[in-house]
Amino acid sequence: MSDLTDAPQANTDTLTTSAPDKLSGFEWWRRSLQYRTGMGISEDEKKQFEHDYRAKSLPKQCTDCVANLDWMLNYSPSVIFMMDHVKKIGGNISKSNIICDVCDDYKGGGFHPEGGILLCSNWITDKWQLEDILTHELVHAYDFLKFKVDLTNLKHHACTEIRASMLSGECRIFNEIKKTGLGDFGKKFQSCIKRRAILSVSANPNCKDTQEAEKVVNTVWQSCFNDTRPFERVYR
């Protein structure tokens, strides 16, 4: 699963979309400005704006997701490479089972051995993020076939998450500098991979807590971080 650790948190409260006059024109501009500046807006109003923004954006997000997926399947070196290697070891991932859809959960996508790959159009912000997420999920698909991953085994889960975040480009150094600045420059790549792997493993029903997830990730770190198959090295 590809987690979106740096996007706005999803609101779990039950909200309804505001009236049409609040979703366009001057009123929408005013609400957008309040949200961006944090001035004159309550926490409840922030949650309502986030809900309205997602509802207002859904049709375009789904259209963009499908268009960007088509582009990546034809032109992205990492996606084409991973699709080819999944196919070589018996996988059946294709455009027919890579689906753009709306997700309630706070994630960018997911992989299921029988269902294929899900891309969460309402959380994906641009073409290049979709490329990272799709590559991430294709690494999971490869691992399930190549290494017989069993997600009830936390070490298996940790290893495939380490590899997926490492090989997908999600933790490329310039992304991390944008998020966290220049501090600990030499450790940013590894820190990002560990953070994402721990977050994913901690959500596993068989994991007791974050401390256990961190322990498992550290246990398998050396072998999994050094395994770049099917790539020769980390390119992205």
Curated annotation (Swiss-Prot):
PROSITE patterns: ZINC_PROTEASE. GO terms for cellular component: mitochondrial inner membrane. It is a peripheral membrane protein. The keyword Metal-binding applies. InterPro entries: Peptidase_M76_ATP23. It is found in: Mitochondrion inner membrane. This is Mitochondrial inner membrane protease ATP23. It comes from Debaryomyces hansenii (strain ATCC 36239 / CBS 767 / BCRC 21394 / JCM 1990 / NBRC 0083 / IGC 2968) (Yeast). The lineage of its organism: Eukaryota, Fungi, Dikarya, Ascomycota, Saccharomycotina. The gene is ATP23.
